[in-house]
């Protein structure tokens, strides 16, 4: 099992190019189940979750051709299509549930394994199931599988999500594209991966989707979607991770291929810690401060209201080095402080009270052997090791490989002493 060896502290300097967005690419790939025509998706990140989704589509009957060093995929439908998404392909990836909506919309039946992914809270699928039930889906769960059918074409409906859910919003939008009539979705997630990418992709293919309010989406069903080519947006969380790295390590970093407007909340927080930030259309130039300022009362919330939950762990590492006490409240997931125990091994002084982390600053990290627990926690451990004194070993980095494209190569180019060991 691979691990990282990092020798710190490291100074970050140079430039990094952001890969395509995993969280945008996954629902776009799942939605290709709706198509009879060829679809070409460009700017894919080369990460494990993308490989898993592509393998799932291949298993279901799509013909897959990789181009441009696997950053582009050409997807063509075979005549024979399966409606069974097995546990072996869905168990490692939360986004596996996203094939349920398009399969029901296209084929009116599906047997889909309950999904896996990072073990950060319950992350219930009931939001997906309750929404798809409104379209006319009938289902039962047996032995870890969702057995679903519909009596012919799905019917447009009105749905107000009881909680804002990224996955349920995506599944509902995708399913509604081929449903009969009009669908109104209220209290939708409006992350850029949905609003700027999934919907743009589907509309380019002939779907009829528009926003009628801040969190209200209208979809008019169509009979079919046309052949299309689309390039996935840059990865918002990778961008945020590198922004934190530069701030943490007193760096001077130019981040390319990402629209800074899509991460403005996090950039504003980094400015509060003392970072100097200049932006242009698709670049961020960030310089870390000599002394990091603390921040009180950060709360993770749904986009765009506050810090993204996927960047909470990275910001916690940054605040360990700040000049005073900081707090982070995690309001999205109930079990997303699993990185804290590992940060304590490096010397962090963090107290957890329910869903709030109280972080004492001025921590001198000392290298240690660490264990990754999930994707974003793994990134946080890498950041901490970069500024720790001495050698750190990070185990179970397969979590990182699920969401970051060759992160060690990118870090090495900007000054980090990092090696992958097998």
Where are these regions (language model features)?
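Short, structured segments at the rim of ligand-binding sites
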Residues: 1-422
